[in-house]
C-alpha cells in the first residue's frame, strides 16, 4: 500500500493508522504523540510497517520504529549503541537490546525523542550515501 503524502508533510501509511486504532486509548495517545513528533523532526521520512510495527526511513534506510505491548510501549532506534550513549537520559526506563520501554505514566522526554530521531536520521543518511 502506497503511503499518503500531504504537501510539506511526512509521507504517512494508512496501515499505521490501523495499527494505532487497535490500541487502548492511553497507548494510542502515547504512540500518536511519538508519530507526530517524528513527522515534525523528519518531515521527509517515509512511514511504513516493518515487522508488524510502525517504522520510519529516510533515503531508503530505516532509522526508528515503535510498538505497543501489553504493559508498555517500546521505541527501537535501530542502533544498539545509541541508547548506551544516552545512558543518563534513559536511566529509570526499562530496556532490552535495542529497545527503550515507556508507558503513559512514564512517557519519553521530548528532548530524548528529539535527540534519538535527529541522530538516527543523520546516521541513516550517512550510511545511504546521500
Locations of regions flagged by a protein language model:
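Charge-dense, helix-prone N-terminal extensions
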Residues: 1-130
Amino acid at each position: 500500500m502506497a503511503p499518503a503524502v500531504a504537501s510539506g508533510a511526512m509521507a504517512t501509511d494508512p496501515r499505521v493508522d490501523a495499527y494505532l486504532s487497535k490500541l487502548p486509548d492511553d497507548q494510542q495517545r502515547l504512540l500518536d504523540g511519538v508519530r507526530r513528533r517524528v513527522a515534525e523532526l523528519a518531515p521527509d521520512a517515509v512511514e511504513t510497517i516493518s515487522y508488524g510495527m510502525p517504522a520510519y526511513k529516510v533515503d531508503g534506510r530505516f532509522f526508528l520504529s515503535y510498538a505497543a505491548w501489553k504493559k508498555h510501549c517500546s521505541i527501537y532506534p535501530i542502533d544498539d549503541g545509541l541508547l548506551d550513549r544516552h545512558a543518563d537520559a534513559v536511566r529509570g526506563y526499562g530496556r532490552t537490546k535495542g529497545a527503550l520501554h515507556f508507558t503513559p505514566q512514564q512517557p519519553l522526554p521530548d528532548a530524548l525523542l528529539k535527540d534519538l530521531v535527529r541522530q538516527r536520521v543523520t546516521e541513516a543518511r550517512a550510511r545511504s550515501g546521500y
